[in-house]
Structures are given as C-alpha cells and as structure tokens.
Swiss-Prot record:
One of its GO terms (cellular component) is host cell nucleus. Residues 44-56 have a biased composition (Polar residues). Replicates viral genomic DNA. The replication complex is composed of six viral proteins: the DNA polymerase, processivity factor, primase, primase-associated factor, helicase, and ssDNA-binding protein. Additionally, the polymerase contains an intrinsic ribonuclease H (RNase H) activity that specifically degrades RNA/DNA heteroduplexes or duplex DNA substrates in the 5' to 3' direction. Therefore, it can catalyze the excision of the RNA primers that initiate the synthesis of Okazaki fragments at a replication fork during viral DNA replication. Its main location: host cell. Keywords: DNA replication, DNA-binding, DNA-directed DNA polymerase, Endonuclease, Host nucleus, Hydrolase, Multifunctional enzyme, Nuclease, Nucleotidyltransferase, Transferase, Viral DNA replication. This is DNA polymerase catalytic subunit. Belongs to the DNA polymerase type-B family. Residues 669-688 have a biased composition (Acidic residues). GO terms for biological process: DNA-templated DNA replication; viral DNA genome replication. It comes from Human herpesvirus 2 (strain 186) (HHV-2). Its EC number is 2.7.7.7, 3.1.26.4. It is found in: Host nucleus.
Length: 1240
C-alpha cells in the first residue's frame, strides 16, 4: 500500500499559491518565461485568455491500457463570476465558460501542483502502484500473498488473441480459447496490500430437455446441438457473433428433474456450456422459443460461487497449489487490469476458503457530501446537473479505517479559495480528529477531475453518504459525462471497461430511487439504511441526527449559500464547515448501525455480492440459495425469461441496465416515507398506505387476512400472543414447496390422505402437498438449516468479545431477513420463480390458525374453573369483577386476548405457559405461539392502529401519528397531552372505558361521564389558547415541502403554494425546491380577499411563463373585472353580492407577514384542525363514528361568537356590547330556553 498524505507548507522563498492566482498577469508568448507573481490572496477567477472555441479534452489514447485521465493539457473552464471579487456587483452573476490550454491545477497550503502528476508527495492520500502505465512501487517491492480477503467480485470476457493473453500460462489460455469468462476477486491482504485474483475456467451453462431438442432440431449427438447454437448466433442481428463457431460451446447429457410439482420425474437434459455471457443471454431469449430453457439467466459470478462448495462472496481465501501442483501465476505490472498492488491468475482449484478467519482487514471507507449552487440569473434556483452554469462548489471527503473505525483524513475540495473557521478547526482538534486539508481549484472541471483522480488513487472499498445514490453521485457523474465528456469506466478498481454508473429505477411516492454500480467500490447510502431501520416523521439529516445521535448540526439554509459563496474565502469556509459536518454526522450514523456487517452476512448466506444485496431486492437472495440446494438434490429451475438477468438493451426513457444488474420485477424494495401529502386535499386527510410487502409488485392471490378488531378502550388486561416466524414455520410444518405440490388428484392417488399428503382448498381449487417422508420440501430444508444456523450464532453472542458479538448479531439478523423473504419469493407473479399456490396456501393456513386459536380460547377457557384446571396458579391472580376471556383482534401473526377478572401481573407470569398450551394443542411443530406483551390499557382504533400501555408503564403506539410533521406544534402537543391523560389518569381511564361500553348515539342525549372533566379541561385550555389574542403565532405554524416547481403540481390549491405566490408577488425571497414552506391560516378579511383575487391573476401569468423559474411581475396584477350581476332576492340590501367563502388553502399566509401586519389567525380552522386530529385518535371511544366524536368533544368548549372585525366595529358604534354565553353548549342551550320562555 502506497500513501503520500498531507498538504505541505509553502517552501521557503516561494510565494503562496491559491486558486487562480495570477490570472490577470499578462499572457506569456509561446516559449517566454514568466516570473512568479507576488504573494496575494486569490480573488479573481476570470482568465482573459480563455479560448471560446476548441476541441474537447483529450481522452486517453487507444494504445493506453487505462481509460482514466493521466494527462490533460486542455479542458473546458467553467467558474462562477461571483468569485471575481474586484468586479462590480452587476458583473458577478452567471459563469465564465470557455476553454483553457494548460494542465489542471490544485492549490493547497500555499503550494500549487498539477492534479494528474504523481510525485513522492501529494495533497491527498494515495494507495496506488501504477499510474498512467508507470510503476511507482518502492524498490524491491514484492509482497507475498497467501491469504487475502474478498469484498467484491467482477466478471468479464477475455479472448485468446488479446494482447494480454500472450503473457498467460497455457492452462489459462485454454480457458479463453477462443473466448472465456474471467472472474476477478478484489480484496485486501492482512498487511493492507490491495489484491486482484483473476480466476479462469468458470463457465456459464443452461439446460434444455433432450427429447424436445432432438425432436425439434433433429440432433443425434451433443456436437450437433453446438453447431445449431453457433448457427443461430451467426444469424443474429449485428456483427457481435459473426465469427462464432461450435467450439464456443460444449454440451453434455445429464439427468435432472424440473423443480415444479411432485409428479415430475428425473429425465435427460442437455447441459450447454457457453463461454460468453452475452451469447448465453441471446440464446436463452431467442433460440427455439418453443423449448423451455433452465437456469440460463444465472450469471458467471453465481456459477463460480455455487459450483465450488464453500466459496463465499465476502470472506477470506487462501492461494494454494491446484491440480497437478500448479501454482497461481503472478501478473507482471505491465499486464495489470486493476489499480491493485498485486494481481494473480489462477483457477478455482487454486483457492480455498479460510473459514476460521472472521475479522476484517483495513478496508477504507469514504464518507462524502457535495454542495451545489445554481449559476444562472436566479442563484436560488435548485441546481440541475445538465445545466453548465449550475455548479458543484464543494466536496467533503472523510476517510475512515473500517476495521478500527478511526477517522484518518478530512479533505475539502473547494471551487475557489476557502478558509475554514478557526472555531471549526479548534472543535475538530479538541475531539482528536485530523485537521482538514483544503484543496482549492480555479474551475469546476479541475475540482471534479481532482475528486475522481483521488477516488481512483485512494480507492476506498466502501463509500457512504446521505442520499448520495439519488443526488450526489448522479450530479457528479452527470457533470463529468454530459458537460465535460469524461469517460468513467476507468475510475473504479478496473483501469478500463469497468462499470461506474447510476440508474434510475423508478419512483417511490415522491422520492426518486436509484441504484449505483461501481466496480470495486461498495456504495452504502445511509439514507436508505435510516429509512429502513428508524421510523421518523422527517428523514432530513438534521432530524435524523437529533433523533439517533442526540446531536444537532449547524444548519445553513440553501438560500444563504450564494451570498456566503460570493463573500470571500472566510464565508466560503462557513459553507465548507457545513459540508464537512454533514459528512461527520453520516460517518457517526454508519458506525452506529454498521450496515456493512449485516449486508456482508446476507451476501455470504445468499451467494451474491454486496452490491446486489443492496440494490437487487429480496428475490435474488432466495433464488441463489434455492439454486444451490436444487443442484445438490438433482433439480433444475426453469428460466423465467428476462427476469433474473437485467436488461441488455436500452428501454425508452430509461437508461440501459447491464446484464445481472437490472431491477428485477417483484423485488422487494421498501418504499421510503414521503415527506409530505403533496397532491392531496388541504386538510391532509390520511391516505391509505401502500403495503410495503408488495412494493409495487403484482401479487396474484389474496394476502393474509385479520380478525376484525373490537374497537374501544379496554382497561382490563390484554395479552398479545405472537406466532414465532409465522410464514417460515408454516412452510416447514406443512412441507410446502414447488417440488411437493400437485394440482392433480391422480398424482397422489397411491398415497394415503393426511398421513402422506395435505389436501387443502385455496381459492376454490384443491391443492395437494406431500409430506416430508415422501419428499422433503426444498424450502423447508433451507429454512431449517438457516434457523439452526441462526440459533447456533445467537448462542455464541453472550460468550463472545464485544467486537465479535456485534458481528455475530449482524449475522443472525441477516439470516432472519432472508428467512422472512421466502414467503414473498413464492408469491410474486412475475418474480424469479413464482408459485402462487404455495404463497396462497401459506396465507390460508395462517387464517385458519387464527380462527382455530379464537375458537380454542373461547371454548377452553370460557369459565374460570376451566382456566384453573390448566393453570392452577391462576387461583391467586384474580382481579375484582367478573371473569371472561375473548379474542378482540387478530393481525396476521398476532392475537389480542382480553382477559377480565385477572391481573396484568398474572398474565405476564402465565402468558408463556398459555402460548405453549395452545401451540401443543393446535399446531404442528415448528409452529408455536409466544407471549409477546401484556397491555394494562389498550385503545384499539382499527386494523393495525392502536395505542396501549404495557405492564411497566411503557406506551406502545402502532399506526397512529401523534406528532405529525404537517400539524403545527400546538396541535401536536395537545394531542399528546390528551393521550397521556387518557392512559395515565385512572379517573379519566375509567370514565373513558364506561363511555366506550355504550353505543355512541346514547351519549348524544345524555351527559358525558363526570370523570372526563380533566380531559375536557385540556380541550377548554386549548380553545382558550387558540382564541387568546396574545398567543404565540409560532406555535401555529404549519409547514409543507416544495417538492417540485409550483407549475409541476397537478393540484394547485395547496396552502404552501399560495404562500409561495404571495412571496413572489411581494418580491420577497421565494423558497427553493425541497425547502419546507412555513405558513399559518388566517381569518378571511377584506384585505385577504383582495390578495386572493390578485394571486389568481399571478398564477395565470406564471403558468404561461417560459423557463424553469417563475418571473415575479413588476407589480401585483389587478384582478380581472367582472360584469356586475343583477342582484337577486337573496342579496343583501344595496345589491352587493355576498363574498365567496375562501378555501383553506387560499387563507394561507407567510408567518412573518402575518406577525408584522397583525393579520388575525383563523381560530375556527385551528380548533377544527385540533378536533379533527383528536377524532382520528379517540373515535374508538365512540364506536369509530367521527361525526359523533366531534360533536361530543365540542360539548367541552365554551360557545362564543367571534364577529368579523368590521361587524364588531358597527355593533360597538351602535351601542351594543358583548353578551355573555354559557360555559358550555349545554349551559347556552338552557339559557336560551329560559330566555324564549320569558319572551313568550
């Protein structure tokens, strides 16, 4: 490993250089010398000698063995004019864009160097041996590699006639004659040397039924089939396979059985070996479509792992002599294909797995973040990578040692000079963190090229950040490829022809989802990890840091970045501090969750690499495991065309996905939570959540059902029984599988019902599954082995050292994840190996188990004497009141049992025994119930929605958002206070329970229970605070995210859009896309009505305006005049029409404006909003009738008339004063009754 780190101080006598210093020096003629400019602070960036025309930067020539930039003498120069600090303000907008003829430069610590020059010292750490074809290894460097750790596996095709083949041993030449697939293992030695091991001899293959092939193609020998295959390829479109011959194939006859159906018997198949993955893909899709292909979509890496027992995708290997004592062959540096320190050629028999080694070598983790800025006329616009003027201005890179978690380096790439604040430097030093190295650049191209050069030279094995897959990487890669035409295939571990790409794989709610593949670099986005592991109302980094790390970052609004950036090096340093601290927080999140450990454990178990584990969903994990086991048992898996491999050709409006890396239909990709209900109605009604389990897949059967809940407030104990691993245990207990299923009664006619097979009706169809003694289920074997492995791993955790315990915990969690994927794997109609009959049977049996449990509990323990017979200890655990036990809810794998006449402590003590009793009585092993928890109070609202307090006092909330981000702080606090009162005040709890026991309609005609007075007092106080003129408006501020341009919204009547247009009309600073817009709802006044009318005209102007950003008018447009209508009999005197009641979205106002102008809040809206939030939670007390709930809650509120301001003024002028009202609606009714009696 070679490393030159740090930023050296300026040599004595040499002037300190900073970005773009000396740009205004006179241009030197060719061949003339130029003296060094005097020391100066870098300010201006514009080069007067930029050529406005020219050629593109020279890419590496064809003779070179690499495609990364190792030399460059001309490039496109783009830099913001805001860096021209001596120029007049009107000249500091936009960007300089031209061509510059010189080598790319970097400035650091007063020194200046070429970005691409490799010397004994450098500004950033390096781990490289070769650069641009030159070997920079120390003299005598010859590392001995015996053991190495593998973290990534690549595959490519080599040809015997290639230049590199001349240096290969004969046995490797045989493997690539005329062509062959080579597997490359990338890893690290214990000493820290980067290694690449090229494994020859791996062959992909597929199966076809021999009888069908012989009948269709008249083949008499395997060689005949090879000739037919070669002919089909030569006739394919294009020139790719023109020279292919039968020598590219080998065919042999084997005996195998189709994995589908019990009655399928072993028969003869052709196994065809193909030397090229592309040829295999074409044949499986196009060769004799009438003949079914088997396992044709399995890539070479999977074949390498599965066909060599014990091989792993992540772990330690040892090089050893192979057959005939043949050793691995070291490659000379001139033949290196990667940026490794040492490379070897070998075959699979030269490799052995070192299973006893479980620690990690010194892999490097890069945590990075970019800051961008729009460079057009509107610098507050959201930057778009395809626009040349929108620039990356800073990139922070934090480099960690993954084995020790130590932060080793902090780098900050800056477009323009940058001085980090002394306070920030002191804070880093006080925490024992390294001092940042600030790298300054004159242009965006130089900065991005330096960043990619650093990535290539340092070669971090793992990369993380926050939303880097959806934003940071796509922005950087788009800039490089679209604006600067830089090829990226050499910037991973491969020196050329490697993959370095991001794909858009669809939309999840309003969040774009992408995947990235970089050869030799594992990208783990912490945004995806956090959304999967933690349930939060907001997933912005600051909110996550507060919730998870108890830390808070120094935030910098995006709208402040342009002003800071243009204000000089010191203010750019503030942006740099912001950029670095984002990366620091993400690094802390990474080492808190350690996602690489769980992902690597899944990769090992499933036999796929980590990148596929991250991005290719759940299906591939189960498929590879099933493929391995099926091969051992003599089964083959049919190829579902185009589903296992990725797309080979570009689809319309979607980037092409290379083979083996595409999104597979049916893969479970958890939806990220959207940030807002954007296109919905203004009141933010709750949407029906799309089930995560389907993830957008087409599921061709009815899913699991639940026992409808008995809604209400239960103050008697409720014990919750859970089925342990419900679906996996059903598959095991009933031996469900593709291979044990039959749809034909005659197939099982020779077997005895119940003893030899299960007969079950699912969806009106009879299905048969043979028992394990007839044929053991492949799925059952997988689950049994996995669960046994998980049990063994968990047993080792308590006795293990802390570091090993963490690793073991991640391994057992990974096994659980894969086990839970098996049921979903079978139930996806367009999945890799669908079997809807199995999935539907699982859910049907699960439903029957819920019903059987309910019937058993109701019959077995209906009387207390019956309970005593099974559990004598219950005699001393009675509670006051009558005894009863009944099921009040069943939710897929949970059963809620309401137990009256028993204490909560009794159920905690007896719960496990009760669960075991039911399991023994009703279910086949390994199905079993477990006592999960016991509620002392439970508010059961609806399916999957409840709030409860378990024994011990902890509150559990499921499916109910007490604190919603689209509610104001006041409503969130009040809602939480009401819930706490309901559960922790026994008087209120008792009254609420009595309330819930009676039909809701009864309470309309009778007073509410006295015990609810404290509950009502909270509502009364909330109403008082809402109507209090001295209230704090900040408590009533709502927010919504501007997720896209206002013109892109289909529903324009949204409150935050109204505020956006009001700000634009007032020529105030408008929010940028992705900003959250704060607003309040104000009362309808004449001024508000006039503003709304003007806004309608402004919306029309903006909708017709070209361009991406709205242009505010010089003055607020006047509303269009309408012809005066003839007054009707309903019009008020004078013929004036009654003003229209404005929509809630039209009443939205900027909080600052409302405070400054004293605009009154709409108290009716806020109280209605509070009641609406309360009704969602507490309607279970009133039979889930929201209308009755709201009506009864209003009883607590004093009735007060709030006339409009103009009406109140007229009343006061006429001598009227405010009349008193009753404290409640009931008292007001009585007062009015007496008044009418008196008047009568």
């Amino acid at each position: 490993m070679f490393c030159a780190a740090g930023g050296p101080a300026s040599p004595g006598g040499k002037s300190a250089a900073r970005a773009a210093s000396g740009f205004f020096a006179p241009h030197n003629p060719r061949g003339a010398t130029q003296t060094a400019p005097p020391p100066c602070r870098r300010q201006n960036f514009y080069n007067p000698h930029l050529a406005q025309t020219g050629t593109q930067p020279k890419a590496p020539g064809p003779a070179q063995r690499h495609t990364y930039y190792s030399e460059c003498d001309e490039f496109r120069f783009i830099a913001p004019r805001s860096l021209d600090e001596d120029a007049p303000a009107e000249q500091r907008t936009g960007v300089h864009d031209g061509r510059l003829r010189r080598a790319p430069k970097v400035y650091c610590g007063g020194d200046e160097r070429d970005v691409l020059r490799v010397g004994p010292e450098g500004f950033w750490p390096r781990r490289l041996r070769l650069w641009g074809g030159a070997d920079h290894a120390p003299e005598g460097f010859d590392p001995t590699v015996t053991v190495f750790h593998v973290y990534d596996i690549l595959e490519h095709v080599e040809h015997a006639y290639s230049m590199r083949a001349a240096q290969l041993h004969e046995r490797f030449m045989d493997a690539i004659t005329p062509a062959g697939t080579v597997i490359t293992l990338l890893g690290l030695t214990p000493e820290g040397h980067r290694v690449a091991v090229h494994v020859y001899g791996t062959r992909q293959y597929f199966y076809m039924n021999k009888a069908e092939v012989d009948r269709h193609l008249q083949c008499r020998a395997p060689r005949d089939l090879c000739e037919r295959l070669a002919a089909a390829l030569r006739e394919s479109p294009g020139a790719s396979f023109r020279g292919i011959s039968a020598d590219h194939f080998e065919a042999e006859v084997v005996e195998r059985a189709d994995v589908y159906y019990y009655e399928t018997r072993p028969t003869l198949y052709y196994r065809v070996f193909v030397r090229s993955g592309r040829a295999l893909a074409y044949l499986c899709d196009n060769f004799c479509p009438a003949i079914r292909k088997y396992e044709g979509g399995v890539d070479a890496t999977t074949r390498f792992i599965l066909d060599n027992p014990g091989f792993v995708t992540f772990g330690w290997y040892r090089l050893k002599p192979g057959r005939g004592n043949a050793p691995a062959q070291p490659r000379p540096p001139t033949a290196f294909g990667t940026s490794s320190d040492v490379e070897f050629n070998c075959t699979a028999d030269n490799l052995a797995v070192e299973g006893a080694m479980c620690d990690l070598p010194a892999y490097k983790l890069m945590c990075f973040d970019i800051e961008c800025k729009a460079g057009g006329e509107d610098e507050l616009a959201f930057p778009v990578a395809e626009r040349p003027e929108d620039l990356v201005i800073q990139i922070s890179c934090l480099l960690y040692d993954l084995s020790t978690t130590a932060l080793e380096h902090i780098l900050l790439f800056s477009l323009g000079s940058c001085d980090l604040p002394e306070s920030h430097l002191s804070d880093l030093a006080s925490r024992g963190l390294p001092a940042p190295v600030v790298l300054e650049f004159d242009s965006e191209f130089e900065m991005l090229l330096a960043f990619m050069t650093f990535v290539k030279q340092y070669g971090p094995e793992f990369v993380t950040g926050y939303n880097i897959i959806n934003f940071d990487w796509p922005f950087v890669l788009t800039k490089l490829t679209e604006i600067y035409k830089v090829p990226l295939d050499g910037y991973g571990r491969m020196n050329g022809r490697g993959v370095f790409r991001v794909w858009d794989i669809g939309q999840s709610h309003f969040q774009k989802r992408s995947k990235i593949k970089v050869n030799g670099m594992v990208n783990i986005d912490m945004y995806g990890i956090i959304t999967d592991k933690v349930k939060l109302s907001s997933y912005k980094l600051n909110a996550v840091a507060e919730a998870v790390l108890k830390d808070k970052k120094k935030d910098l609004s995006y709208r402040d970045i342009p002003a800071y950036y243009a204000s000089g090096p010191a203010q750019r340093g503030v942006i740099g501090e912001y950029c670095v601290q984002d990366s620091l927080l993400v690094g802390q999140l990474f080492f808190k969750f350690l996602p690489h450990l769980e992902l690597s454990a899944v990769a090992r178990l499933a036999g796929i690499n980590i990148t596929r584990t991250i991005y290719d969903g759940q299906q591939i994990r189960v498929f590879t495991c099933l493929l391995r086991l099926a091969g051992q048992k003599g089964f083959i898996l049919p190829d579902t065309q185009g589903r296992f491999r990725g797309l080979d050709k570009e689809a319309p409006k979607r980037p092409a996905v290379p083979r083996g890396e595409g999104e597979r239909p049916g893969d479970g990709n958890g939806d990220e939570d959207k940030d807002d209900d954007e296109d919905g109605d203004e009141d933010g009604d709750e949407r029906e959540e799309v089930a995560r389990e389907t993830g957008g897949r087409h599921v061709g059967y009815q899913g699991a059902r639940v026992l409808d809940p008995t809604s209400g407030f239960h103050v008697d104990p409720v014990v919750v029984f859970d089925f342990a691993s419900l679906y996996p245990s059903i598959i095991q207990a009933h031996n469900l599988c593709f291979s044990t299923l039959s749809l034909r009664p005659e197939a099982v006619a020779h077997l005895e019902a119940d003893r030899d097979y299960l007969e079950i009706e699912v969806g009106g169809r009879r299905l048969f599954f043979v028992k394990a003694h007839v044929r053991e289920s492949l799925l059952s074997i997988l689950l049994r082995d996995w669960l046994a492995m998980r049990k063994q791993i968990r047993s080792r955790i308590p006795q293990s050292p802390p570091e090993e315990a963490v690793l073991l915990d991640k391994q057992q969690a990974a096994i659980k994840v894969v086990c839970n994927s098996v049921y979903g794997f079978t139930g996806v109609q367009h999945g890799l190996l669908p079997c809807l009959h199995v999935a539907a049977t699982v859910t049907t049996i699960g439903r029957e188990m819920l019903l059987a449990t309910r019937a058993y509990v109701h019959a077995r323990w209906a009387e207390f004497d019956q309970l005593l017979a099974d559990f004598p200890e219950a005699a001393g655990m009675r509670a006051p009141g009558p005894y009863s036990m009944r099921i009040i809810y069943g939710d897929t794998d949970s059963i809620f049992v309401l137990c009256r006449g028993l204490t909560g402590e009794a159920l905690v003590a007896m719960g496990d025994k009760m669960a075991s009793h039911i399991s023994r009585a009703l279910f086949l092993p390994p199905i079993k119930l477990e006592c999960e928890k016991t509620f002392t109070k439970l508010l059961l609202i609806a399916k999957k929605k409840y709030i409860g307090v378990i024994c011990g006092g902890k509150m559990l909330i499921k499916g109910v958002d007490l604190v919603r981000k689209n509610n104001c702080a006041f409503i969130n606090r009040t809602s939480r206070a009401l819930v706490d009162l309901l559960f922790y005040d026994d008087t209120v709890s008792g009254a609420a329970a009595a309330l819930a026991e009676r039909p809701a309609e009864e309470w309309l005609a009778r007073p509410l229970p006295e015990g609810l007075q404290a509950f009502g007092a909270v509502l009364v106080d909330a109403h008082r605070r809402i109507t209090d003129p001295e209230r704090d408006i900040q408590d009533f501020v709502l927010t919504a995210e501007l997720s896209r341009h206002p013109r892109a919204y289909t529903n324009k009547r949204l409150a935050h859009l109204t505020v956006y247009y009001k700000l634009m009309a007032r020529r105030a600073q408008v929010p940028s896309i992705k900003d959250r817009i704060p607003y309040v709802i104000v009362a309808q006044t004449r001024e508000v009505e006039e503003t709304v009318a003007r806004l309608a005209a402004l919306r029309e102007l903006d909708a017709a305006a070209p361009g991406d950003e709205p242009a505010p008018p010089a003055a607020l447009p006047s509303p269009a005049k309408r012809p005066r209508e003839t007054p009707s009999h309903a019009d008020p005197p004078g013929g004036a029409s009654k003003p229209r009641k404005l929509l809630v979205s039209e009443l939205a106002e900027d909080p600052g404006y409302a405070i400054a102008r004293g605009v009154p809040l709409n108290t009716d809206y806020y109280f209605s909003h509070l009641l609406g939030a309360a009704c969602v939670t507490f309607k279970a007390l009133f039979g889930n009738n929201a209308k009755i709930t709201e009506s009864l809650l209003k009883r607590f509120i004093p009735e007060t008339w709030h006339p409009p301001d103009d009406v109140a003024a007229r009343l006061r002028a006429a001598g009227f004063g405010p009349a008193g009202a009753g404290a409640t609606a009931e008292e007001t009714r009585r007062m009015l009754h007496r008044a009418f009696d008196t008047l009568a």
